[in-house]
Every structure is written in structure tokens, then in C-alpha cells.
């Protein structure tokens, strides 16, 4: 049985950064396991200048990511709470410069740096089973070519994302605040270049988001609740396009564009947190620890933050350090939730629509408590 100091489950930014931190700063022999094959489309998002501090901590020069990985973001235009456009850097008032992230380039660079420094990555790991015996973790999985494998380690990191299947196996259940999903697509327009700009527009059933990823490519996503999506059939391309055409500002920006794939993606976008006590020598990072509404633009930034801080707590073998990490996560989520609530409270035009009733009712409940 192959043995490692630490195993990280999940190959996104949180997992790759955790693996890099364990290897670079704690001299651990690290294995990273990923369920997928890294071919799925990864949606870019806005990041603040602080991401470069975490890259410096991981000893990763910005030059290694390529010229197009961090594109300057020239602001955000919103139609939120009013039919009049407003222009600002971020609805969450991010300080300093912001950038549009090329997720494919970013994720690949993190993983390549991990491998080049001696880390091991195994993709396409299915049917995972986890157990702990005498403070040693055993991870079983099935690989399509190598068959059934068993590996063991001292430390286990859950970076498996919002679904946090690994944590669920261990009885660490997240608490979901809502059922938000994103239904979207990449789009191209051969006759018109996209601006490096973000647009957000609220509507009766949720809100729309658009960002120019390059002059040739943009992303458009509709955010609503799962049951509303099903009732409106927003996951059907023809219906999605119909409602997109009914938006105000975004419809004009995408006129003449075509989706790059006939099928839309549907991705979970709900807010969630974890209150369970963690098993010994185990920690959750990124979306597996806390998940944020995309309106916050906190996903990647938090992935890097939690990765760097969690690994220090994990390898300290101190329950107090892990407890402090969990308390820090609770504080971050509480602060995020207050700000997210304020954002949704700004939109008062559709008080009788289910999506907004839920946000305003939850806000009232929070104030009452």
C-alpha cells in the first residue's frame, strides 16, 4: 500500500493550493486525487489584488501563469434595485484593482507547479471510500486503467467542492442557506469584440451575469433557485435564450452571439457552511468548508485563503489550532452573510416574486434573531 504524509481530495484551486502549501512549507509527501479528468469547463471569475499575496506565499511568480491569466477588470455595471445602470468596481466593495481570471490557465499552473515540485496527481478516481484507523487514513478508489487502489496517509484534506462528498462520508454535514443554481454558457461573437467588463442585472426570478473573458469569448449565466429553474425550464437552451433576450443591458451586449456548446451548464451556487466537529487529522477547504453566492465574487479568493491557513492548522497536530481555523471560518461566513443580505435587500422591485421573497424573508429572520 502506497503511503503519503497527506492526501488532498479535489483538484480545483483550493485543493491544488493546499497540496502546494503542504509540500512547499511543511515538507510533506502529498498525493492529490481528482474525480474528473480536468477537461470540464471552469468558469472564470473576478479576483482582487490580494490573490497575488497568496501566490507569493506559495512561491509562484505571476509570470508563470501567462499574460492572459489575470486580465484587468475595467469595472462592473449593474442594474440592481433600479432600471438605471450604476458603475462600480464591485458590489462587495473590493478594495484595489480587480482582475478577470482565466480559470483553465490558473488551475493548470497550480497543478503543474505541484507536480514539478514532486507532488503526485491521480485523476479519474471513482467510488472513493474513506476510513481512519489508529490515526491513519485509508483511501480506496477505482481508476479506469489501474483498477482498485488503496493509499494511506496521516493527514486528509477535503477540497471536493460544494457537494463535499468526502466530508459527507465522514458525517460532516453542511448546512445549506438556499438552493441557488447558475445556468449558463460561453458565447462567441465573430462580428463584435467583447469588453473586459462585468455586467449584472436583476430580474423577477433572480439575476443575470455576463463577463468578457477575452475579446473573443464571454460567459453569461442566469442565477435562480433550483425549483424556479425547473418550473421555468431555464435549463433548456431555447427558453434560456428567450429570457436572455428580455434582459435590458445584457441582451444588447450579446446581440449576434452564439453559445460555444449546444447544452447549457447547470452548477450549484448555494451558500453553505459547516458546524460539525471535524475528525482528527482532517480539514475541509474552499467550497467544501464554506460556499458563497457568486454575487460575492469570493470563491477563488477564499479557496486560496483557506488552503494556506488550513494546512498550517492541520499539520500542527493541535486541536486548538483546528478549532481556531473553524472559528475563523464561522466569522468569515457571518461577515459574508451580512454583506450578501444587504445586497439582496437593495432590490425591492419584485416583493411578490418567490426568489426575492425568499431573500427578504431570510433577511428578516436574521434581523429577528
From Swiss-Prot:
For binding FAD, which residues are annotated in this chain's numbering?
10-14, 103
| UniProt key word Oxidoreductase | yes
State the name under which the record lists this protein.
Answer: Putative FAD-dependent oxidoreductase LodB
Q: Which organism is it from?
A: Marinomonas mediterranea (strain ATCC 700492 / JCM 21426 / NBRC 103028 / MMB-1)
Q: What Pfam families does the database record attribute to this sequence?
A: FAD_binding_3
Q: Name one GO cellular component term.
A: cytoplasm
User: Remarks, anything else?
Assistant: The intracellular stability of LodB is dependent on the presence of LodA protein.
The catalytic activity of this protein is classed by the Enzyme Commission as 1.-.-.-
- Family matches, as InterPro entries: FAD-bd, FAD/NAD-bd_sf, Flavin-dep_Halogenase_NPB
Free-text function comment from the UniProt entry? Is required for lysine-epsilon oxidase (LOD) activity in M.mediterranea. May be involved in the generation of the quinonic cofactor of LodA, leading to the active form of LodA containing a tyrosine-derived quinone cofactor.
Please state what class of enzyme this protein is. oxidoreductase
Q: Where is it located? A: Cytoplasm
Identify the keywords attached in UniProt to this record, alphabetized: Cytoplasm, FAD, Flavoprotein, Oxidoreductase
Gene3D superfamilies reported in the protein's UniProt record: 3.30.9.100, FAD/NAD(P)-binding domain
Q: Which GO terms describe its molecular function?
A: FAD binding; oxidoreductase activity
Taxonomic lineage from the root: Bacteria, Pseudomonadati, Pseudomonadota, Gammaproteobacteria, Oceanospirillales
Main location as per UniProt? cytoplasm
Free-text comment on the cofactor: Binds 1 FAD per subunit.
Q: Which cofactor does it need?
A: FAD
* Gene from which this protein is expressed: lodB
Deletion: any effect?
Answer: Cells lacking this gene do not show any lysine-epsilon oxidase activity.
